[in-house]
Swiss-Prot record:
This is Small ribosomal subunit protein uS19. It comes from the Bacteria. The gene is rpsS. NCBIfam families: rpsS_bact. Belongs to the universal ribosomal protein uS19 family.
Length: 98
């Protein structure tokens, strides 16, 4: 369920301040953050933010089409290794009829 418009978007204060400082200085550094629930604002566009996925920091380059989404949407927390081998590896499911 989306956040109430009355409250406004949640953006981590320290993260927003670091982005604004970098914008004023014209710097482009990778910022580490644990704030997966922060919403991406237009100030973030063009920066690379390393978002924590529970194990490591995943670098996320923020583009125009990402504004309004949350940082955690772009750093997956689970790795899909595929389903169990079984029938798919053996070469077929049913014998062919003549």
């Amino acid at each position: 369920m989306p956040r109430s418009l009355k409250k406004g978007p949640f953006i981590d204060f320290k993260l927003e301040q670091r982005i604004l400082d970098m914008n004023s200085k014209g710097e482009k550094k990778v910022l580490k953050t644990w704030s997966r629930s922060s919403m991406i604002s237009p100030d973030f566009v063009g920066h690379t933010i390393a978002v924590h996925n529970g194990k490591t920091h995943v670098p996320v380059y923020v583009g125009d089409n990402m504004v309004g989404h949350k940082l955690g949407e772009f750093a997956p927390t689970r790795t899909f290794r595929g389903h169990a081998g079984g029938k798919a590896e053996k070469g077929g499911s049913a014998p062919k009829k003549k």
